[in-house]
Amino acid sequence: MTRILDNDLIGDEGSVERTLRPQYLREYIGQDRVKDQLMIFIEAAKRREESLDHVLLFGSPGLGKTTMAFVIANELGVHLKQTSGPAIEKAGDLVAILNDLEPGDVLFIDEIHRMPMAVEEILYSAMEDFYIDIMIGAGDTSRSVHLELPPFTLIGATTRAGMLSNPLRARFGITGHMEYYQTADLTEIVERTADIFDMTIKHEAAYELARRSRGTPRIANRLLKRVRDYAQIMGDGMITTQITDKALTMLDVDQEGLDYVDQKILRTMIEVYQGGPVGLGTLSVNIAEERDTVEDMYEPYLIQKGFIMRTRTGRVVTEKAYQHLGYPYEKTIKT
């Protein structure tokens, strides 16, 4: 069953996000620290008539990395060519993409951490000095061909910055950490989406929905669609706080934005492991989820909300989690 609070795209959400996508930094809601930096760097590059330094955007799924890449290209007034790490299977794929770039273009590589190493190594000289050397032919007839490239800006997006090699990471002159959104910013995003799709929503309802959306615009917009459905069938179409609460409760999204999987993780840690510490691998097996899924999809929000802590000996449930789930808290828990 598809998880309503999944950070990744579901169904036709890609086309929906393109409809909602802001075009320029002034329209982009949230991520003020990243925006303020980019505004300066982009304007400086334009005044010097140079390509922008390469940009690395990292953070959890659904926080606007792809949107930011398109905004950067629009601000620069250049074309954006988009691909992804898994799609570039061999060196020839990357060479073809690079050879098709025009001066000043933006090349956006999503999930850049998933590129094969042989492909990644070609990027080094392309990023640093705008050229690539490739081997043509095989055996005794093989020869090296030197290709000059036009100046371009590479924007890499990743949910796992730690998996990037040091040589690749060092070639990004600009890094932007896309953080979870504040409730006020998410509220504005919810109201903007409602306006675009001609929904009627009370400000208090938008705030309540934003508060329970895990700091993630993608999740907020997804929940808004389901709340709209509920309001249409169970009410008069107006999205109120009461309607929002009832709809989210029906969807198993609690007051802290946790769903049944989040609660299962916390309850397992409390009931089976006495609050921890417990290793990530052991916990993943117990709840029948992949280790990477737990680490990338569930754990970041639980840590950000203060429900679990990482320690040297494993994950530990906090007093806040005990209180939220209604368990008595024992202060003798080891950390």
Swiss-Prot record:
Keyword Cytoplasm: yes
Domain of life, source organism: Bacteria
GO CC aspect terms: cytoplasm; Holliday junction resolvase complex
Database matches in SUPFAM superfamilies: P-loop containing nucleoside triphosphate hydrolases (SSF52540), Winged helix' DNA-binding domain (SSF46785)
Positions of the UniProt region annotated as Large ATPase domain (RuvB-L): 1-181
Example GO molecular function: ATP hydrolysis activity
Domain notes: Has 3 domains, the large (RuvB-L) and small ATPase (RuvB-S) domains and the C-terminal head (RuvB-H) domain. The head domain binds DNA, while the ATPase domains jointly bind ATP, ADP or are empty depending on the state of the subunit in the translocation cycle. During a single DNA translocation step the structure of each domain remains the same, but their relative positions change.
Family: Belongs to the RuvB family.
Name assigned to this protein: Holliday junction branch migration complex subunit RuvB
Natural source organism: Streptococcus equi subsp. equi (strain 4047)
